[in-house]
Every structure is written in C-alpha cells, then in structure tokens.
C-alpha cells in the first residue's frame, strides 16, 4: 500500500517564487483601483493623529537611491503608525522653484533666459517641474510608498505661494525682514546670492601669498624707515578691495630685520615664517596688538590707505597674524569694518568681473586676475613669498563652481530677532539621534542673518514695493493681504504679469503722497519656500496637524530644511513646527566611499526594483542602521534577496501546513498546548515585543534582524523541525496536530502583520491566503499583533534554554556520527545520554526527548552509571556525555522512525504502532 496518501502533506497555492518584478505592479494596480490610501484613512478616521510631514524632494530628474532610502523609511513609519492604531495621513510634496530647474531649462531647451520674457521663461520652468513631478510620483509609488498621491503639495501651487507670502508678512511685521548691504555667498556662474545651505565644500588649489604693506604713519610706535606690515591671503583678487589690516589686541607682534627693511608679524608665527621664508628674521622690537591700532599703511598698488585695526577673529593657525581686510568680500571683514566705520568696497560685479573701481583689472574675472595681481606685486617688490595650497573651499551646490564673497544689497531675515526663542524651542524637540540637537543648536547659535533674496526668475517674488517719488520700501499688513489674495487666485505669475498698481490695494498712497510704485525684482530663497510648508501644508490641510509629530530627512537638513522650517515657524508663531526630528545618514559603498558617478559605485533603485523587486529594496532599508551612513552594493542587495527568500519560504511553509485549519473551529486553548508549542509562542511573544519596540524607537534594523533570526533559528532550525513529524504524521484532527497548527497560525498571522510596513507587497499578497481572513480585507488596515502575557512564561524560558543547550550538544554528536558514517540520518539513530546528577534530574522530567532531538530513541542513563569509552563529551555542559548508536527495530514506512513495534499490526505490517493506529482510523 502507498501510505503517502495518508500523510498530511503541506499544500498551498501561495507561490514559492516571489517573482516580484512581475507581481508587484499587479498589486500596485489593485491598490490604485481600490484607492488603498482612502481605504486606510477611512478605517482610521477618528483615531489619534500622527503626522509625518514630508520634506519635499526637488522636482528634477529621476529618483536616486537616496530618495528611495528616504521615502521608504517614511513609508515604514506611516504604515507602522497606521497599524498601531493611529490616523497617520501622508501628504507627499515637491520643491519646485529655484536655480537647478532654471539651469535645466536653459540647458535642455537651449533657452537664453535673457532673450525670452520673464513670464515665458517661468512657464517653461513650471512645465519642466511638473514633468518631473509626474515621473518621480510614479517611481515613488512603484517603491510601494502609500500616500495621497492625487493631492500632493507643490511649492508652485497658488495656495502654497499665498500662504508663504503670509509667513513673510508676519516676519516683516515683527521687523525681522530688512534690506542691507552685506557680503553674501555669491555664485558668479549662476549670477545670484546663495544661502549657507546652498554651499558645499570641496578641495581647491589656491594661490597663497605674503604681501608687504609699507607703513605710512607709524603713530609714534613703528618709527623706523622702511617698515612694512606683512599680510597673507589665499584670495589675491580681493587685494584691490583692501581697506585695513586686522591684528589681535592681545597677541605679541615683533618687528624683525630683513636686510635694510623692518617687517611686522605676530611673534607666535615667527618660527614657521623663518622656516617658510628661509630667513633669520632677528627680532628688533616687540609690541602688543592694541599698541598698533591706528597705524596707517599704504596699499601696495593703489593710491589708498590701509589702517591697522583690531579684531577677535585673528588667529595664529596660518599666515602672519596680520589679516588682510576687505569689508566688501568677507563677513568677518565686514563686521570689523563696520565697527571702525570703514566703507564697504566691492569692485566686483554679478558675473565675478572687476568693475571700474577695480582699476587696472576692470573687466577681468577674479580667477583670471589672480596671476596678474601676483605679477604686479612682484614688479613692485611687494611680494614676500608665493605658494600654492590645497584647502577646503566653498562651492555652489548646483553648478559646483567656486563661489565668492561679495557685498551687495540683499534682503535678510534677522536671526538675532528670534535666535533666543529658536534655541529654547530646540530644547523642547526630540532629536533622533540625540547628537542632532547639538548640531542644529550650534548652527542657530552661530548663524548670521539669513540672505533670503535671489537674483533669479523662477520662484516666489519678494512682496515689496518701492515708492517712485521718495524711494521708500513699501510693505504692510494691507499690501501683504492684497498680494496674498491675488496669488491665491492667480499664483505668483501675477507679480510678473500685472503692474504694481494692480498688486496694491485700490487707491494706495505712500506716506509721502506718492502714487507711483515699482516692484521688487528679486525672488525668495527656495529654502524659504520649503521652510514655510508648516503653514502652507500643515496648517492649511484639515487632515493634517500643526506642529507635525515628525520631520524625517537626511542629516544635511540640520542646516537646510529643519533649519529654515524652525526659523520661519519660530519667527512667525514663536514655536517649532515639529515635535520630533529624525535623521538618516548618507549612502556609501562597502568600502565606505560615497556614491559617485566617477567611481561607478552607485546602485540605481529603479534597476533594483526592475530586476529584484521593491520589497528587496525595502528590506535593505529596514536592515540598515540608517542613522549612520548606509552601505549598499550589488552584493548587499543579493544578500537581501536571499534573506527575503528565507522569510518568504518560512511564511509559505506555515501556510502550506494550515490548508485544513479553521481558526474559528480548530484552535487548541493555550493551557492544552504541549510545552514545545508554548515555547514557540514564548519566542513569538519576544519577537513581537522586540519588533514593536524597534518600530517605536525607529530602530528598524531591530525589526529585520528579529524577524530574520526568528525565521531562521527559532522556527526553521528548532520548532518547525521538531513538529514536522506531528504535522505530517498524526491524525488530521488530532489534538497534537491541531496544537501545532494553532501555533503556526498565530505565528503566520503575527509575522505577516509585523512585516507589513516593510514587505508591503508581499504582506498584501499573502494576506488573503491566511486562514480566517475575510475576503476583500487589507493587511494595511489591520492592527499590529500583541504579545499575550500568558505567552511570556519566564520559568518555561529558563527550562527550554537548558533543554536547547542539551539539544545543541546532541545535534553536534549526531553530525559527527554521520561524518564517521555510523549513521546516515538522525532517524536511524538512538542517542544514549550520560548526564551529571543535576542534568539527569532535569532530563527525567522531559517526556518526549526523541521528538525534540528528532531521533528514533533516547536512552537516559543514571548519573552514577559508568560511562563507556569513546563517548562524545559536551563542549558547553560539564560532565555530559553522548553516545550515538543505531536505533533498534525496523523503519516505519510512513513516518521513517525506527521502532521495535513495526510488524505488530498484521493489517499494516510495515508501520509502527502509532502510524498503524492513525491509518486504521482514516
């Protein structure tokens, strides 16, 4: 007789192969048809809210792996919070204005922005942004990210722009907005001012020169003829703007002799200068810095004085301790110059070329002027030493060219006006990781005023007018309200389409009586755009809330979006726009190198999704300790694919053994479960606790490692290995089999829900197969499982820790016996155990050792019994010996266990008594 048909063999229609690249798009289409976002929101209506506010990606190009990491982390958080019982809406957004889009329109459409009208150029920029919003939206959706994709927020929307103008108006009313002449970061290539957040640092080779400034009036301190003050600079092009030399009031300065000349340098730099210049530099006189204040030097090549002044920013890290000072080309220079009433001279235009004030260098680009100026200094015998240095230098974030400091009239937000309040708010926010708090605190504490104006076209205009009669700047609650009203109807294009009179309240008159006005031509910094999303989105959308529960972006946003959002929110409302801020690190390869095109070490998320599936990418995100830099490579993705396969196969095995299980009818009560089953539920309880803790603390790698280890070790290597016999061999409706199925059901039901925020497609695919699940239900509307208190039995855990330690030693002995060809399979073996007295007492209380060890028989010997020779002694259990022998009896044809009772049943002579009984009752 073929007894195979009498076994309860595993069976399921759930596919073994994930085939994710084909199956995921089908699931995505189903979500779209059923409107999964609306379904979930409806299911959570009236629950406590959790609002994660999306930091808007830039609407330019295809998504890259950084986007994928960011969006998947957010999706995991939102889906977990939904399943934790919260109403967790997610409104995705896009940052749509600014220089990068202008550059792409100029480059890809071949447009000369100066040759087309402003309105036409803005139309092209808007079309370009909308094109990439559509492209990126589909790419994000393909990653399995759930959100209100039909109603995202866009910084170019009319309502958004109107709300942004409102925030600007609130700040202006509090006198936080002002116009000033100050040095700002300036990109000559892009012809615009830049904010600190738009600066990136890269290595650059620069000229480093030491220059002599002859003393003109020594003020009774520097009395010798032919005395020179020596300065050092890495920007020779700024020398035409030199107005002063700054010393530190407390430093010691020395006059040294060089042939017939006398040079002044800081004493603290003397040894390094002797070495560099290869000169003896004998000291003639000493002075304290403050004694030299007011000494007047002559500019080396311009008919102009250069005065010695004092400043705290002077250091002895490099140079001579005598700092070349050009108030038009540096923030510290500007500040110290302001203290001394120096003019702000900036002989460089918006393209980085010298103006007429640059004298002989007029029309030259600053970088081209460097060698010319150095040559002129040589000819004038004013050059002491010339060198080249490699150093970290500020570059434009978009064109990657070096920037300059340039004094221009710009609009600023005064950070001093709300700095104290912002620092107090930082203390109230939860920063994850905690070092983020110090980082943003120091940035706000040290930050200069925020330059918010840009000399570009594609953006939100600064809503300020000028009276043509008196030149006064016009901004008031009344004018802001009118501009808001128009923008809400027409968008910011109205600023460029309408004359000033139509943008102002009807009959508006300046205080001077003037009735003719012109508009400001600058636009706002894009960081002001995205930085006001707390108003434009959180306050304006009824389904959201202000402040947000969480902002989550890369750690570079401490100086970017977190910073601008905090600044505008505190300035306008006196409060931070977020309760917590979470950051992720950056992507690196396995060698810790940053992703770059030149290294060819990038991983394309669209390619991974196409070849492996989005759930593999999502599992990688979950597995990464993303709060630090995240390693990625094709090899790592392959590892994730293998881990996914392990999890999927485990879930499939559970399903296949539940094909005849109805949880409503077939459950076995916890109190009636055998110990091994209660141990499995104990492990499930611990995993559930750990996973939920991981989600709550945003430590998603805990989620991955807990579930993966549970599938690989506690389930596959222990529990499932042990209960396979029961599942396949015991009577279909036997209590023993139903007990195992009860556990399998609880494990399956819990694991699918625990992993649903991560393996979003796979969880959706498997959910309809889970026994007892109502047709048409969604795993995304389910709630997270809980660890029942009765499962968490400490005494049981302690007992099974010991038992599994014994099992581990037995497994080693069986493997050695197999290698020594004593047995060919554990079921052909009988294991003889020789324990110490304590262990014997413990093992006598375990009734089913052969089931736990998966052998045909176990013989437990007394502790006092003499141990035979050749015994395998346990490595980790003192005095415990194991002997592996061939099992007595015959092999049961049905369960393959060797049993001396095989042949006793005449009807089924090839079966053991257990199997004969089961088959007889079929």
Swiss-Prot record:
EC numbers for this chain: 6.1.1.5
Subcellular location: Cytoplasm
Record note on cofactor: Binds 1 zinc ion per subunit.
Motif 'KMSKS' region positions after renumbering to this chain: 594-598
Molecular function in Gene Ontology: aminoacyl-tRNA deacylase activity; ATP binding; isoleucine-tRNA ligase activity; tRNA binding; zinc ion binding
Motif ('HIGH' region): 57-67
Binding annotation for Zn(2+): 892, 895, 912, 915
Main location: cytoplasm
Stored PROSITE patterns: AA_TRNA_LIGASE_I
Cofactor(s) the protein needs: Zn(2+)
GO process terms (BP): isoleucyl-tRNA aminoacylation
Role description: Catalyzes the attachment of isoleucine to tRNA(Ile). As IleRS can inadvertently accommodate and process structurally similar amino acids such as valine, to avoid such errors it has two additional distinct tRNA(Ile)-dependent editing activities. One activity is designated as 'pretransfer' editing and involves the hydrolysis of activated Val-AMP. The other activity is designated 'posttransfer' editing and involves deacylation of mischarged Val-tRNA(Ile).
Descriptive protein name: Isoleucine--tRNA ligase
Organism of provenance: Desulfitobacterium hafniense (strain DSM 10664 / DCB-2)
Encoding gene (name): ileS
